[in-house]
Amino acid sequence: MNEIILLKLGELVLKGLNRRTFEDRLVANARRRLQAHGKFKVYTKQSTMYVEPQSEDCDLDGAWEAMTKLFGVVGLSRARACAKDKDAMLQTAVEYLGDRLAAAKTFKVESKRADKSFPMTSIQLSQYVGGELDEKYPNLTVDVHHPELTVYLEVRDYAAYVHADPEPGAGGLPVGVGGRAVSLLSGGIDSPVASWMIAKRGIALEMVHFFSYPYTSEEAKQKVLTLAKLLTPWCGRLTVHVVPFTAIQEELRRKCPEELFTVLMRRFMMRIAEAVAQRCGAGAIVTGECLGQVASQTMEAMRATTAVTTLPILRPVVGMDKEEIVRIARKINTFETSILPYEDCCTAVSYTHLTLPTICSV
């Protein structure tokens, strides 16, 4: 039988009566990600999602890469389906995992019977297949605690599946089950990470970027669009709302005290973000603010900017160290783009900030 991808569902299996809604969203998200890689059959059964190629020209490697970035999945494996027979599973293990079995020094076999009508217990099946493999491959020694290779046998309703060590999935919840938010994407390290973290909790995103030409360059805008593209494999399709911001900044420079410039600018950003949110049906605003990281990100400054909107402000990186944020940025492949030397509107036009602004002062 053909090679397929098995995906283990995450916390969505605990959603009770809402579980079907979560699973349907996950399947829809998977199908959209797979469109570029060929025709696949995608369905869920028994806490597992199956991705089955429907033609020889399907790009299974590309499909695998896409599924590693699918929120809602905690583990995934490339597997070979076979008949629900102990000898068929043994033969499939030899054919499908033979090279890895020949290269390993220690191994074990783990079996799972979702189909309880199968005539052997899970332990009996593991002992049978493990014993036969141990005899066939003299290089192998059984190690049930710390094996170099684990062979998994899954007996399900319509077929059995053989695979080796699964890889971790993206975790989280399917994008879209938690509603919609607008995320302020500046071009720095923090805002893409904040967007990724919120998408991981099932929130669909629309991005807002404030563009201050000629103080910021076309390259700076392109950098932000590139960051959005890098987030797309995780977050799904993203719309970037590019907001001309030069006139507001110039007016603030003329009329407001220098020490209040940054906090007033951010209050305008929140008002505009709220207007965008209302137009696209979003229920929250996401920022990459990190408490104490810069002078404009104190608790008092955050309170002053939050006061102008009735929407909740989600700050997923607010309590993280910079090293933690950078580690995630490297993982999601946004770091190298974020550090390109193009200024955003906050750094290109700025003054010394008041670190403890009050609501009355602004």
Regions found by a protein language model. Name each.
Residues 10, 163-165, 208-210, 243-246, ...:
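Generic beta-strand/beta-sheet core signal
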Residues 228-254, 344:
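A conserved beta-strand->alpha-helix junction
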Residues 353-362:
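Single conserved hydrophobic/aromatic residue that forms the stacking wall/gate
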Residues 188:
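Conserved G/P- and acidic residue-centered "switch" motifs that form tight phosphate/ATP-binding loops
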Residues 333-341:
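A short alpha-helix-loop-beta-strand transition element characteristic
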Residues 293, 341-349:
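Small/polar glycine-rich anion-binding or flexible loop at a beta-alpha turn
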Residues 1-182, 192-238:
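RNA-binding accessory domains that recognize and position tRNA/RNA substrates
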Residues 128-133, 139, 166-178, 245, ...:
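Active-site adenylate/phosphate-handling loop in enzymes that bind or generate adenylated species
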